[in-house]
């Protein structure tokens, strides 16, 4: 399940589809805006004001008709997301703000669902694989962090989230297949 279809989630979803991951879930509530184009490679100028999750579902299904692409056009919330998350083996945290990331962290802990966190800001990116109750969780890394430090306020160089999103897809493929050691496993 890819949660967030922006700069991280767009390339992550594309690579999961290209790899033939049987079922790719997509969750986002946003629409395409002109400010997205420098880093969100699934969308085009003609897509402005259209649902990101529906556009991504259409594109990924055309790209690889052998996979199932499930779309959840909704905002992340503990009430609605847990039932969706439990349907998947791994979640990719492709969100763009700490508050939502920490909410996803808690839902994944509650459902015991492994997740691959990715983040990018300015010229920097990070990624880690979190297996609930086998090591630290995302809140352990950011117990006193400020919610003021997010992409909307700080900006991000377009290729940075692309690189991190591709790494998240690679980690998800390794996790699902059991091949190799996860990079940055917490």
Sequence positions of predicted segments:
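Adenine nucleotide-associated cytosolic modules
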Residues: 1-185
């Amino acid at each position: 399940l890819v949660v967030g279809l922006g700069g991280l989630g767009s390339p992550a979803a594309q690579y999961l589809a290209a790899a033939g991951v049987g079922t790719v879930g997509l969750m986002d509530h946003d629409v395409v805006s002109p400010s997205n184009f420098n880093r969100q490679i699934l969308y085009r100028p003609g897509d402005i004001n259209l649902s990101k999750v529906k556009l991504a579902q259409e594109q990924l299904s055309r790209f690889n008709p052998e996979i199932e692409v499930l779309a959840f056009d909704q905002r992340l919330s503990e009430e609605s997301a847990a039932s969706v998350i439990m349907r998947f083996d791994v979640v990719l945290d492709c969100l763009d703000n700490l508050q939502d990331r920490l909410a996803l962290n808690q839902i994944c802990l509650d459902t015991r669902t492994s997740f691959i966190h990715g983040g990018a800001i300015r010229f920097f990116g990070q990624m880690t694989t979190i297996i609930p109750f086998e090591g630290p969780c995302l809140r352990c890394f950011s117990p006193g962090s400020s919610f003021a430090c997010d992409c909307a306020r700080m900006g991000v160089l377009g290729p940075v989230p692309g690189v991190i999103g591709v790494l998240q897809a690679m980690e998800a493929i390794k996790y699902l297949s059991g091949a190799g050691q996860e990079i940055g496993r917490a």
